[in-house]
């Protein structure tokens, strides 16, 4: 596997230079776009990596999966009274659909849905940002994981559209907490700094029927893990979930920091990172690397 990962990275490196980093978040705009890393965490506990797999990056929307798992853990099926699990077919920060559907987000991976999940968690935890950080630390077994306060503040200063979504949902009585407090927590979650190895390990429980092998803790039931994977498969890649299913064939979740996590049920979890994004906001080179990996080892679930 180690040799295969290096071979795949060599094959996709010519694509470096295409795409564009997420400069609409100023703190992310200065990230070097020529970086590329990948890690695979098997259900047997083995870790394989190549390239810049130990370089920290901002996980951004990948954090939405962690928030969702926290909410399911303490509230179960009740969360679906406030949001759905359908693909949106609209931009991840769309307000039009939210207005039309009376403040009920389509799924937990568009921004409005993630804010509802954060609102649910805010009511549950005394210190939501610390609870999230500690949860992620336990999932990956790395107690040095932190949130980048500069990235979080940069996002908070450009919060207008997210704030608009939150206040719109509040007008439909689907947002109960203080908007500014929830936004602060949301951006701290997005600003978690992790590397490919950390993220591959942190998502291992979703490839293992909800069981985190290295900690010995059942994070979700097997059924719940399957449900989370299904939402990742249909809604995890912004407006490119269909293309990702066609090319890679795995449940996945991306972030504008350039990371993509993919789940191989019963087998492994994978994280690839390269900061330059395509037009849909997903890592251009990362998509290509995952496509090659899935094809070489026949990992598609379809």
UniProtKB/Swiss-Prot annotation:
Any GO molecular function: glutaminase activity
InterPro entries found in the cross-reference section: Beta-lactam/transpept-like, Glutaminase
GO biological process terms held by the UniProt record: glutamate biosynthetic process; glutamine catabolic process
Domain of life: Bacteria
Enzyme class, spelled out: hydrolase
Reactions it catalyzes: L-glutamine + H2O = L-glutamate + NH4(+)
Residue positions binding substrate: 61, 111, 155, 162, 186, 238, 256
Coiled coil: none
Keywords, ordered alphabetically: Hydrolase
EC number: 3.5.1.2
Family statement drawn from the similarity comment of this UniProt entry: Belongs to the glutaminase family.
Subunit structure: Homotetramer.
Protein name as it appears in the record: Glutaminase
Gene name in the database record: glsA
């Amino acid at each position: 596997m180690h040799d295969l990962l290096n071979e795949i990275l060599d094959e996709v490196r010519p694509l470096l230079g295409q795409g564009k980093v997420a400069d609409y978040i100023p703190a992310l705009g200065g990230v070097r776009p020529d970086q590329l890393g990948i890690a695979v965490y098997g259900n047997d506990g083995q870790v394989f990596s190549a390239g810049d797999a130990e370089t920290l990056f901002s996980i951004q929307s990948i954090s939405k999966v962690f928030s969702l798992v926290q909410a399911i853990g303490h509230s179960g099926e009740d969360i679906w009274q406030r949001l759905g699990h359908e693909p949106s077919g609209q931009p991840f920060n769309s307000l039009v659909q939210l207005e039309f559907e009376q403040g009920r987000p389509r799924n937990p991976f568009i921004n409005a849905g993630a804010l509802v999940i954060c609102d649910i968690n805010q009511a549950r935890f005394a210190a939501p940002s610390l609870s999230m950080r500690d949860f992620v630390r336990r999932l990956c077994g790395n107690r040095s994981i932190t949130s980048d306060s500069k990235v979080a503040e940069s996002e908070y200063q450009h919060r207008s559209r997210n704030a608009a979504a939150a206040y719109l949902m509040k007008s439909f009585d689907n947002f109960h907490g203080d908007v500014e407090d929830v936004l602060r927590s949301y951006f701290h979650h997005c600003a978690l700094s992790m590397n490919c190895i950390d993220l591959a390990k942190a998502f291992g429980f979703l490839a293992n029927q909800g069981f985190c092998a290295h900690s010995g803790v059942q994070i979700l039931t097997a059924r719940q893990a399957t449900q989370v994977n299904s939402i990742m498969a249909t809604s995890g890649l912004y407006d490119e979930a269909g293309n990702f299913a066609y090319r890679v064939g795995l449940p996945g979740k991306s972030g504008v920091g350039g990371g993509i996590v993919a789940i191989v049920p019963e087998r492994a979890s994978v994280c690839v990172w390269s900061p330059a994004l395509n037009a849909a906001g997903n890592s251009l080179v990362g998509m290509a690397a995952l496509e090659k990996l899935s094809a070489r080892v026949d990992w598609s679930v379809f």
